[in-house]
């Protein structure tokens, strides 16, 4: 049982990207699409959401083997000013009791690192954007099994993680010259992926066209 909390505006595209990755496993996986209860989507119809998604309130009594929290295009907003931040706090606390392992992506990773570990983020002078070579720091991590030693990973973010605020309760798993990419709890219950393993071959091009308008 895997849950996907989809915070992205284009929910159909994001769910397809993650479904493609999850579908590559030989295991039989049941994917539940989840959305924030308190937030009204401007880019996905309510009919679509009611048909294919459940709110977090509707799934919070369930147990999940894995839970994915996506990014969100709100990098410029302080965490506490995000409209659905209180619900995010409840969800992050809930993952500690109802989820075996959680993966946080991009903004989701920044938010969870801030909440659980007090990790600070810094606004970059320019947006980190493109496909960059990365370094595997911990080759023994089960999360990185089958990954090359120097993977090329899509990056699209305005903020960077303050390395000095990363404490001993976290382990750096993947690093790069463009910044930290992946960290994990020492207990192995959560991983924080600051870039975009889910992006397809059009994602960066479409973001570029959006940004230059």
Task: Specify the residue positions occupied by each region the protein language model found.
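Conserved phosphate-coordination/catalytic loops
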Residues: 47-50, 82, 86, 155
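Residue-level signal for well-ordered alpha-helical segments
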Residues: 44-46, 72, 111, 149, ...
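N-terminal beta-loop-helix "entrance" segment that forms/cooperates
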Residues: 37-50
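Short glycine-/acidic-enriched loop or helix-start segments at secondary-structure transitions
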Residues: 14, 43, 78-79, 113-115, ...
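Cysteine-nucleophile active-site neighborhood
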Residues: 69-138
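Amide-donor transfer/coupling interface in amidating biosynthetic enzymes
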Residues: 1-38, 53, 59, 63, ...
């Amino acid at each position: 049982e895997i849950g996907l909390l989809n915070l992205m505006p284009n929910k159909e595209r994001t769910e397809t990207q993650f479904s493609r990755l999850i579908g590559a496993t030989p295991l039989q996986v049941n994917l539940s699409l989840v959305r924030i209860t308190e937030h009204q989507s401007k880019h996905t119809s309510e009919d679509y959401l009611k048909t294919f998604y459940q709110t977090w309130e509707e799934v919070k009594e369930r147990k999940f083997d894995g839970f994915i929290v996506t990014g969100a295009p709100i990098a410029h907003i302080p965490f506490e000013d995000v409209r659905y931040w209180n619900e995010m706090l409840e969800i992050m606390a809930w993952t500690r009791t109802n989820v075996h392992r959680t993966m946080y992506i991009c903004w989701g990773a920044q938010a969870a690192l801030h909440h659980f570990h007090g990790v600070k983020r810094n606004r970059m002078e320019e947006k980190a954007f493109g496909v960059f070579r990365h370094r595997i720091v911990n080759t023994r991590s089960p999360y990185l099994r089958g990954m090359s030693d120097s993977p090329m990973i899509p990056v699209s973010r305005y903020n960077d993680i303050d390395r000095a605020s990363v404490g001993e309760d976290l382990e750096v798993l993947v690093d790069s010259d463009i910044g930290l990419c992946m960290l994990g709890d020492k207990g192995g219950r959560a991983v924080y992926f600051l870039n975009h393993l889910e992006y397809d071959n059009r994602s960066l091009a479409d973001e570029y066209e959006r940004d230059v308008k």
